[in-house]
Amino acid sequence: MEGFEQYIEALISLHSGLERQGPGDPGFSEFIIEQLPQLPQNPRIADIGCGAGAGALILARKFHSRIRAVDFSKVFLDQMMRRAAQEGLQDLIEPIECDMGKLDWQPGSIDLLWSEGAAYNISFEGALKTWRPLLAANGVAVISEMNYFSNKVPDVVAKYMKHAYPGIKTESENNDLINSSGFRVLAVHRLPSIAWWDNYYDPLRDNIAALKDTGDDVMQAVINDTEEEMNLFRAYQDDYGYSYYIMCAV
């Protein structure tokens, strides 16, 4: 457990200061918001696995409603609130440091649940089952999940995912999973691969350059894993990536 905790601490340090802790794009997020069905006035919103707040800030600007922003890392939450203060949005965002799989909120208390690149931490299936009771009647969820884009997966990708993300499924399998978990899929949109590079991997490279070869074995292991991930995506970005699932509670 100690080794795992050290690895996570190094992972947080590597991503500290970045606008995003995973692939995404503000323009794409705004596009997704435009696809949502009509929400109640002043919707109750949660961003689960918010990281440094890239999504929460967009949601606050768009809806002018209070956002419950959940993450396990105080480092990222503090970074989010500094950015929120710079934009005058601090009163709209409530930072919540906790385990996303153990939210003790009232059932039916969320109108829009938003989660980008975080559900895998408790498995996509686990996230659907855990978060479904939180949604109000006809509540809407937007959850992004890394998945295969077809049933034909290159062997090198399948081998990598066996240890990196053994729970990965195809887009079609995730659609079926959503529809059998108390939701109905409204739309699915794939995050363009350029969003991985422009908004995540390229900025991350600067942090890697600053922290590489510092003599910290744990950090070096994190960097090695991250560079392996980058190299795989560069070669096989047409075969897998993030899909944004828009769904409603049924």
Segments (PLM) and residue ranges:
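Conserved alpha-helix/loop element of class I SAM-dependent methyltransferases that forms part
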Residues: G22-Q41
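Class I SAM-dependent methyltransferase SAM/SAH-binding core
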Residues: A46, A52-K102
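A short acidic, Gly/Pro-enriched loop at the edge of an enzyme's catalytic core
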Residues: G101-L112
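Short alpha-helix
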Residues: G167-G182
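Conserved Class I S-adenosyl-L-methionine
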Residues: H189-V250
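Short, glycine-/aromatic-enriched active-site segment of Class I SAM-dependent methyltransferases
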Residues: M146-Y165
